Amino acid sequence: MSNAGGSSWEGMNPDVVEAQARILQGLSQEITALMNKIEGETSQLADAWHGDDSNKFAAEWAGTHKPVFTTAATLLQNMSDTSARNAGQQRSTSSG
């Protein structure tokens, strides 16, 4: 079986997969932090902007954009968790 690099081996390098899991976790945390920053900025706008356009803007953030950030962060965290779990299983299998 060939992998993306063209070599023909099967298995996993758990060190690399665990490193990738940490990167994915960090990206999830960065997205969450960015989402929280945008949430704060949106809240501050509500103090300086009133009316229908302001309400529409806030509703669009809360109903459309924020859920996308939440989903992206969750998916990255799930990928991180799966990668870390698979690396742990590989270590157990290889050492057993």
What is each residue range found by the language model?
Residues 1-96:
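N-terminal secretion-targeting helices of virulence/extracellular proteins
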